[in-house]
């Protein structure tokens, strides 16, 4: 490893020791970029890596709100504007009780390179709160969102920082956030947020975009291996917007999700989640997002409580699509032993570093990284920004075609970057290198500040 790269990784481990998720993603990305640093000693002269691992700015604020009983609560909010070298800051908002500064920074750092891979002019950012919308009334969520935006609005804008949804932040929350932004600013700037409803400037297929893009990326991997998606059986974790998008697009292209996992266990449906079953997934999730067992009850298929589907052998592709560090070493060993060839990360950093390195070392496996695979979500957010700027609404077919083109290009540039540096078909390193190169050169050309 390049000595400068190693020193920056050590620096992050020392100065951010209480933020393990952030340390993990920095180590995962920087461990791939030694060839670039060897080829560009000028980057070390301006201390580019140490600047890159520190956010440009980080806002922390209190969010006070009143529940339906008239009792007051205070949560913490964050917005991390990590890197704006290639465009306005762009990244989602996560409302989840386990959110803290380290998770926001990890997501913002990862977002920087993901956005770079899309080819669109978007910098990296992330934000959120330790507020949990689950179990809250619509009125309580509205009051929280209004308070959150009151603290945030002065730091964002269509050409400054454009938040979007993430875990715990869907169309309802985006609507409340935009309503408060408009109330405070007194202007119509619907490009300030993405993931909006169609009635006020949203984009078609945005909720499904991450899942659709993941399947398009898988399709490119299969093409590279002279294989086809037709008939492929997929095992996924999660059945939210991302998981549902995977199910729907896989079915359209002739594949099927035969295993999917939720918080309470996993489902095995040999016939796949297709047809009207896709509609039932939406109904089930809306009623109770914590339990997938009702699917087994309705369709008479197998439900395994309290377990994940990692290690099942009668599938062709694994796609972790739930949350970070879902797949640890024990699960990775089961996955490798199953003989399955394709491991396609979809959630942000769903695999621990030791598990990821273990899977990458398996000669029979191809591993694709989340920052490339799930970039379709933010890619379509970027397309929503374009539509807002043009005062136009594109058809679903137009958006889907642009998404498909984008995912093909992300796979192409990742594979080419790996090949350029003698790494074969290493998509993990290739995505890190391809995303890093653009950001690094932009930072270098803009000087030290």
Residue ranges and their predicted role:
Residues 61-122, 126, 130:
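Phosphate-interaction motifs
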Residues 42-71:
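Structured beta-strand/loop patches that form or line metal/cofactor-binding pockets in enzymes
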Residues 2-25, 221-222, 336-449:
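Adenosine-phosphate binding glycine-rich loop
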Residues 202-312:
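Glycine-rich phosphate/diphosphate-binding loop of Rossmann-like nucleotide-binding domains
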Residues 20-23, 39-46, 119, 156-165, ...:
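Flexible, glycine/charged-enriched surface loops at secondary-structure junctions
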């Amino acid at each position: 490893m390049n000595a400068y790269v190693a020193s920056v990784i050590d620096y992050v481990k020392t100065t951010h020791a209480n933020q393990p998720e952030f340390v993990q993603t920095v180590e995962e990305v920087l461990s791939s970029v030694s060839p670039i640093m060897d080829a560009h000693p000028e980057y070390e002269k301006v201390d580019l890596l140490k600047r890159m691992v520190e956010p440009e700015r980080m806002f922390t604020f209190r969010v006070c709100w009143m529940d339906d009983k008239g009792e007051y609560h205070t949560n913490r909010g964050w917005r991390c504007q990590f890197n704006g070298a290639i465009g306005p800051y762009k990244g989602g908002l996560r409302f989840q009780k386990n959110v803290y500064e380290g998770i926001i920074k990890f997501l913002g750092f990862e977002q920087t390179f993901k956005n770079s891979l899309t080819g669109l002019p978007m910098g990296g950012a992330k934000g959120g709160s330790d507020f949990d919308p689950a179990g809250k009334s619509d009125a309580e969520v509205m009051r929280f969102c209004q308070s959150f935006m009151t603290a945030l609005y002065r730091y964002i804008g269509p050409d400054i920082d454009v938040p979007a949804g993430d875990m715990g932040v869907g169309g309802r929350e985006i609507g409340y956030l935009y309503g408060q932004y408009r109330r405070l600013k007194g202007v119509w700037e619907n490009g300030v947020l993405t993931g909006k409803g169609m009635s006020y400037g949203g984009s078609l297929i945005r909720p499904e975009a991450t899942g659709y893009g993941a399947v398009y990326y898988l399709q490119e991997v299969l093409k590279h291996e002279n294989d086809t998606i037709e008939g492929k059986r997929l095992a996924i974790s999660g059945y939210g917007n991302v998981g549902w998008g995977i199910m729907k697009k896989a079915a359209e292209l002739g594949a099927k999700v035969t295993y999917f996992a939720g918080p309470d266990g996993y489902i095995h449906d040999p016939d796949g989640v297709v047809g009207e079953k896709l509609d039932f997934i939406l109904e089930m999730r809306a009623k109770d997002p914590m339990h997938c067992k009702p699917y087994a009850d309705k369709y008479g298929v197998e439900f395994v409580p309290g377990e994940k589907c990692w290690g099942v052998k009668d599938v062709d592709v694994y796609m972790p699509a739930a949350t970070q560090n879902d797949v640890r070493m024990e699960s990775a060993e089961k996955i490798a032993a199953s003989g399955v060839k394709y491991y396609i990360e979809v959630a942000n950093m769903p695999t621990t570093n030791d598990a990821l390195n273990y899977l990458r070392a398996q000669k029979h496996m191809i591993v694709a990284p989340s920052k490339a695979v799930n970039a379709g979500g933010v890619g379509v957010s970027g397309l929503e920004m374009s539509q807002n700027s043009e005062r136009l609404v594109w058809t679903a077919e137009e958006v889907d075609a642009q998404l498909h083109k984008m995912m093909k290009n992300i796979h192409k540039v990742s594979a080419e970057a790996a090949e350029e540096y003698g790494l074969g078909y290493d998509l993990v390193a290739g995505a890190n290198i391809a995303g890093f190169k653009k950001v690094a050169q932009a930072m270098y050309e803009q000087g030290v500040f």
